[in-house]
């Protein structure tokens, strides 16, 4: 995993996992909104007591990371994807200052797609593919 901090409260992560599974103890007290894009592979994990989540190539997941601990499996023994992470409200303030021409209400997005503890997965979102594919074309020296 390679993480780049773009602005205060905004990070970009390139995820490249080559394994069958791992156990996560991740817990946070931060108010987060994470957007995960799966480029290749598949990842599965429990997303609460009565919920299970998976993402595979072309899927987009919006998540608050409230249920991000437990046993993660990679049925294809690999996963490649990108995560854009927002730590609210710091990220909201940074975006207002750094990207004034692109008004986005992160709290509203979080409320729309992540109103519960469970992630929202959009399976097979081809209209989103090109946006995330462009992030793989970023020159190494600025990653």
Briefly describe each language-model feature range.
Residues 1-81:
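N-terminal functional module of multi-domain proteins
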Residues 46-143:
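Alpha-helical bundle regulatory/interaction domains
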């Amino acid at each position: 995993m390679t993480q780049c901090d773009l602005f205060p409260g905004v990070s970009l992560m390139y995820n490249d996992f080559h394994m069958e599974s791992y156990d996560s103890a991740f817990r946070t007290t931060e108010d987060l909104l994470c957007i995960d894009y799966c480029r290749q592979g598949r990842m599965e994990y429990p997303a609460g007591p009565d919920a299970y989540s998976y993402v595979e190539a072309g899927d987009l997941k919006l998540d608050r990371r409230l249920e991000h601990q437990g046993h993660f499996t990679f049925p294809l023994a690999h996963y490649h994807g990108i995560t854009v992470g927002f730590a609210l409200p710091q990220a909201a303030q940074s975006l207002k200052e750094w990207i004034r021409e692109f008004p986005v209400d992160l709290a509203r997005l979080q409320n729309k797609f992540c109103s519960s503890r469970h992630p929202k997965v959009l399976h097979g979102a081809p209209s989103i593919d090109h946006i995330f594919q462009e992030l793989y074309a970023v020159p190494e020296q600025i990653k």
